[in-house]
Amino acid sequence: MTPDGCPVELYGLLPAAGEPELVHRSIPAGASVLDLGCGTGRIAAPLAALGHEVVAVDESAEMLALVHDARPVRAHIQDLRLPTTFDAVLLASHLLNSPGADDRQALLATCRAHVSAGGQVLIQWHPAQWFDALRAGTTHEGELGPVRARLAVHAIDAGLLDAEVSYRAGDQQWVQPFFARRLDEQQLGEELAAAGLRFGSWLDTGHGWFSATPV
């Protein structure tokens, strides 16, 4: 288990699901990339194979031990301050929907501190419409490679989702609590501005990814 309760075995099974290609086509060829919260490198390694120099950051030594073809850095994202900047900073895994405002600002501050003057931050999030489609007491299932995932919604109160996520792969199963904050586009813009960033553009049709640039 990682410090935040993530099962390393599970994350080692999860394949990339189009994220490396989305990032690759959104940034210049050969652009340097800082992957924040890289996990086992399921995005970092394919980006390296596509010609990018990638620095992969995670707080878990166990996760980083599975990272290949990228330079691993063990650190809490919120505390990270490297002596260099990058053409692209990647904040995936819906970390922007963290429940606490202080956590979100700390994540964005790290993004801002490491993006070059002409670079961009690429962020994956759950948009407001994703939350609006959920109802307390419902379950939602899907597959990620060999892993079957199930989201059980307990409650949505004042924009805070209280849920449980379970994963199954073969005869193995992992269960985790899941909390996420709903942000609308106005709130998103305000949080970006507070961190010295400006909304750029949507990177996919479902508005699950967007770019931001330094102010």
Where are the regions a protein language model picked out?
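SAM-dependent methyltransferase
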Residues: 122-187
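Residues lining the SAM
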Residues: 92-93
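A short glycine-rich, Lys/Arg-flanked "PGG" loop and its adjoining helix->strand segment in the class I
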Residues: 105-117
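A short acidic, Gly/Pro-enriched loop at the edge of an enzyme's catalytic core
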Residues: 81-89
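C-terminal lobe and adjacent flexible extensions of AdoMet/dcAdoMet transferase-like proteins
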Residues: 187, 191-215
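Conserved class I S-adenosyl-L-methionine
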Residues: 1-39
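Class I SAM-dependent methyltransferase SAM/SAH-binding core
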Residues: 41-79
